[in-house]
Each structure stands twice: as structure tokens, then as C-alpha cells.
């Protein structure tokens, strides 16, 4: 999305439909290469389970399982980079017959979230055959992506608007000052 639409922060390693490119640690290294001498700023790879296992098949023999929360597991390789493994639908694109697997390499402070507490109100409804209580609650959150600005004029964006690349503008002049990189594996549509 925001990261992937920038040519200097996205490495597309996908192949044609007949010869898909399997995710590998070497491919992830090509993604971190986009940061040049600041490659060590990429501290975390976010990927789905299938992509992680493809990398495991390749060379991830000495990983340590740090912890697991529900279906999200956090692992670490010998270089100290963390692998957050979760089957996030946005990391896989099957549009038009493609089978593209995206991996995000993120820096420290790549994302910032601030939430407000849940405010709940209850009101009794009287004078009817049965008693009722109407409850209403709301909360909000603020999200920031390092080196990017969300489109002006969009108030209370939906999930679809937040994941639309056109709604994000990169304000950092160098890729090294952004949230990170995207590496794409798999195959393009025919």
C-alpha cells in the first residue's frame, strides 16, 4: 500500500505465471538492500504463514520462537531480525490470476498507534411491555506511518481508505527515512 507504491521502497521479485518465484531469505536481503548503508534499520519482517514456511524451506534453520499470541507468532533469525507471522489477507494478492506474496520489512518506529478509551453510554427505555436498555459505545484511534502522510480531507477513514495506496503520500525525501520496504514474491497474472 503506502510502502509498495514507491519504486525505491518496493522490490518485485515475482515471476511469470509459469515460473513463480518462491520467497527466500536471499530475496528478503534484496529488499533490505533498498536501504543501502542503512539496511540494518530494518528490524522486522511481517509475512503470512505460507511465506514464512517457504523461507524456512530455504535456509531458516536456526530461528528462535520468541513467543506466540493467538495465531500470531514472533520468531527471530540468527541475524537478530524478527519475523512476525500472521495470515494477514493484505499480504496476498490473487487479482486476475496472480499469486503474489508480499513481505514488509519495517524499521523501528515504522507505525504509531494511539487509541482513546472506549466511551459507553446506557439508557433505559421505559413505558413498554418489557424493559430495555440501549447501549452505545465509541472509540477512536490515530495511526501514523513513518515518512508518509495520509491524504488531506479524508475524515474518519474506513479500512478500505487506509489500505488504498493513493491516499498516502511519502513526505520523507529518502527511503532510509521511511517505515521500510516491501518485497514481492510469487507470480504475476498471465
Regions picked out by a protein language model, each given a short descriptive name:
Residues 1-5:
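Short, glycine/acidic-rich hinge or "gate" loops at secondary-structure transitions
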Residues 12-25, 29-30, 50, 54-190:
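Sequence/fold signature of self-assembling virion shell proteins
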Residues 41-43, 48, 135:
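Hydrophobic alpha-helical segments involved in membrane association or supramolecular assembly
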Amino acid at each position: 500500500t503506502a510502502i509498495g507504491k514507491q519504486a525505491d521502497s518496493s522490490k518485485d521479485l515475482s515471476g511469470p505465471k509459469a515460473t513463480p518465484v518462491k520467497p527466500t531469505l536471499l530475496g528478503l536481503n534484496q529488499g533490505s538492500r533498498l536501504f543501502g548503508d542503512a539496511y540494518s534499520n530494518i528490524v522486522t519482517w511481517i509475512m503470512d504463514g505460507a511465506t514464512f514456511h517457504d523461507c524456512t524451506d530455504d535456509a531458516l534453520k536456526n530461528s528462535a520462537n520468541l513467543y506466540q499470541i493467538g495465531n500470531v507468532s514472533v520468531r527471530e533469525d540468527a541475524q537478530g531480525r524478527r519475523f512476525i507471522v500472521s495470515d494477514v489477507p493484505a499480504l496476498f494478492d490473487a487479482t486476475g490470476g496472480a499469486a503474489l506474496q508480499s513481505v514488509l520489512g519495517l524499521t523501528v518506529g515504522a507505525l504509531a498507534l494511539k487509541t482513546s478509551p472506549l466511551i459507553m453510554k446506557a439508557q433505559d427505555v421505559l413505558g413498554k411491555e418489557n424493559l430495555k436498555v440501549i447501549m452505545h459505545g465509541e472509540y477512536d484511534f490515530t495511526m501514523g506511518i513513518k515518512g508518509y502522510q495520509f491524504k488531506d480531507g479524508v475524515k474518519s477513514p474506513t479500512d478500505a481508505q487506509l489500505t488504498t495506496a493513493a491516499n498516502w503520500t511519502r513526505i520523507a525525501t529518502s527511503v532510509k527515512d521511511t517505515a521500510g520496504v516491501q518485497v514481492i514474491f510469487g507470480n504475476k497474472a498471465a
